[in-house]
């Protein structure tokens, strides 16, 4: 694929089971995703939707779901016309046990060179995943920043 890709790897001192739960439980997601709510059954073929203040921000389909190991989703940005015009991207979460920790690898890609959307998520994912790591290890998020609709 000659497209655009963002990869982020972090190690979180938690079990793969608890990390999986954090990736797929709406109440937990809302804590580290700056108040955004997510709806999905997290089963292959099911849809997922993410909302900020009641407005649809992103949506897609669950393409793979292997508990505690791998979650693959199609991803369509719904709120910025220039991002939506790029079409569906693909977001992959891979979890590997590493001793007392879990290794989380996130890969967000699109089959489009120089994607503006991948450029934007490459700034957003580090904040989200830093919050996830902090929440799971300390019980509190690292950042309280909330993206507005114009960001």
Placement of each model-derived feature along the sequence:
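Short beta-edge strand/loop motif at the mouth of beta-sheet-based domains
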Residues: 7-8, 24-59, 146-151
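A short, structured loop/turn motif at beta-sheet edges
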Residues: 16-17, 63-70, 94-103
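Hydrophobic pocket/interface hotspot
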Residues: 19-20, 29, 48, 62, ...
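Hydrophobic/aromatic beta-strand elements that line small-molecule binding cavities or substrate pockets
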Residues: 10, 59-64, 89-96
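Short, highly charged C-terminal tails/helix-capping segments
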Residues: 134-151
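Beta-strand/loop substructures that line and gate deep hydrophobic ligand-binding cavities in soluble
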Residues: 80-127, 132
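Short, charged/polar surface micro-motifs in flexible loops or helix N-caps
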Residues: 54-56, 64-71, 77-79
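Terminal, regulation- and interaction-focused segments at domain boundaries
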Residues: 2-16
């Amino acid at each position: 694929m000659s497209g655009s890709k963002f990869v982020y790897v972090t190690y979180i001192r938690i079990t793969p089971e608890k990390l999986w739960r954090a990736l797929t439980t709406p109440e937990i997601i809302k804590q580290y995703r700056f108040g955004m709510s997510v709806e999905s059954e997290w089963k292959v073929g099911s849809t997922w939707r993410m909302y900020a203040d009641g407005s649809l921000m992103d949506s897609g389909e669950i393409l793979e779901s292997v508990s505690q190991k791998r979650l693959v989703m199609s991803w369509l940005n719904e709120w910025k016309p220039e991002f939506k015009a790029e079409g569906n991207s693909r977001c992959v979460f891979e979890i590997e046990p590493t001793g007392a920790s879990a290794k989380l690898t996130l890969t967000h890609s699109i089959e489009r060179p120089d994607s503006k959307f991948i450029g934007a998520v490459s700034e957003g994912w580090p904040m989200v995943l830093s919050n996830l790591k902090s929440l799971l290890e300390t019980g509190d998020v690292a950042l309280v920043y909330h993206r507005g609709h114009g960001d």
